[in-house]
Swiss-Prot record:
Belongs to the GcvT family. The lineage of its organism: Archaea, Thermoproteota, Thermoprotei, Desulfurococcales, Desulfurococcaceae. HAMAP family: GcvT. This is Probable aminomethyltransferase. Transmembrane segments: none annotated.
Length: 375
């Protein structure tokens, strides 16, 4: 399959972006360097183009019923004008297809933003489940028409105000507004949300409007940031990514209970969703693997735990790294990992095999760094 191109690619090339492939897309990986972009988001503000992610509208009688069948959270409790917060779509083995945050546009109208690697598959999956339930809902793909931007950081509100979006500063977390004016254009949707652990806004706008907004954000002081920085930021924050922390194959991936997603992603009082029986069995029987955070100890600060590296306690192989990076915030290697539940004690020391050398790390809860404004 040919590599897909971002609908704002020309803009990013004009800003000096370097490109790489991610989930079948040619994406801006960085502009001035991942370290600078990462710290800009932690200290002030950065703006990302995340248009490689999915965007689809599910509407019509039965749309909410469809989402209740697919998701582990009771999304029907979500108020119009708000996102549901994170929830999971499972397969019948209680493995995770995707983690998503549906936007409720109306009583029977939702905006879904699947992760890039599964956007096409989720479009087909929604249609398949709707058909099996006998629901005549409309499912529309918006990716060709609308871009998706993320303005993130403790200074995101300042940048938004300078762009003329001051009336959006009263948005609560996970609240959104339709037809919002920014930078002299109208955005389809602006939400108070993000995936970096910082304050911020996610903006869905038609292509030309999105170009205007991106440029205006940069002029107001937001640093253009690439996908590489978005990944290091989400690792620090403890946010998951398909193909790293979860996947559908039961021979490779632990069940969703092991993910310890938190944030109310699973409503244990809910019944009737795909994968429910397997999920309850997994919880009842207990899990072998637990997702935890790792922070390298000071002596081993420059050792970076990468995906696939093995973990040891007294020479016993007890798990593996799912995602890792060097944290510029604390100056140490950090990671997310799965560890045998018998050894998953926060605060304990574990060894990471980094290219044949062992380094000590501390097991830590998420987030792995302090979040919010910092100097």
């Amino acid at each position: 399959m040919p590599v897909r191109r971002h609908i704002l690619e020309d803009l990013h090339r004009s800003l000096g972006a370097t490109f790489g492939e991610f989930a079948g897309w040619s994406v801006p990986m960085s502009y001035e360097g991942t370290l600078k972009e990462h710290m800009a988001v932690r200290r002030e503000a950065g703006i990302f183009d995340i248009s490689h992610m999915g965007r689809m509208i599910v509407s019509g009688e039965g749309a909410t019923e469809l989402l209740e069948r697919i998701y582990t959270k009771r999304v029907s409790k979500t108020k119009v004008g708000f996102m549901s917060g994170p929830t999971l779509a499972l397969n019948e083995y209680a493995r995770v297809k995707d983690d998503e945050m549906p936007y409720r546009l109306g009583e029977e109208e939702w905006l879904i933003v699947p992760n890039a690697a599964v956007a096409d598959a989720m479009l087909e999956y929604f249609s398949s489940i709707a058909s099996s339930m006998g629901l005549n809902v409309s499912i529309r793909d918006l990716r060709e028409r609308y871009a998706l931007l993320a303005l993130q950081g403790p200074g995101a509100a300042r940048v938004m105000e300078e762009m003329g979006g001051g009336d959006l500063l009263d948005l609560k977390p996970l609240q959104f507004r339709e037809n919002a004016g920014i930078a002299g254009v109208t955005a389809y949707i602006v939400s108070r949300s993000g995936w970096t652990g910082e304050d911020g806004f996610e903006i869905i706008a038609e292509v030309e409007a999105a170009k205007r907004i991106f440029k205006a954000a940069v002029e107001a002081g937001a640093k253009p940031a690439g996908i590489a920085a978005r990944d290091t930021l989400r690792i620090e924050a403890g946010f998951v990514l398909g193909g790293h922390e979860y996947g559908e194959d039961p021979l490779r991936w632990p069940c969703a209970v092991s993910l310890r997603y938190g944030l109310g992603a699973i409503d244990w009082g809910k019944k009737g969703f795909v994968g429910e029986a397997a999920l309850r069995a997994c919880r009842r029987e207990g899990v072998r693997w637990i997702r935890v955070g790792l922070v390298m100890k000071k002596k081993y600060a420059r050792m970076i735990p990468r995906s696939g590296y093995r973990l040891y306690v007294d020479d016993v192989d007890v798990g593996w790294v799912t995602s890792g990076t060097f944290s510029p915030v604390i100056g140490r290697g950090v990671a997310q990992a799965y560890i045998d539940s018998r050894y998953a004690y926060i605060g304990d020391t574990i060894e990471v095999d980094v290219r044949g050398k062992r380094g000590e790390a501390r097991l830590q809860e998420f987030p792995l760094v302090p979040l919010g404004s910092r100097g």
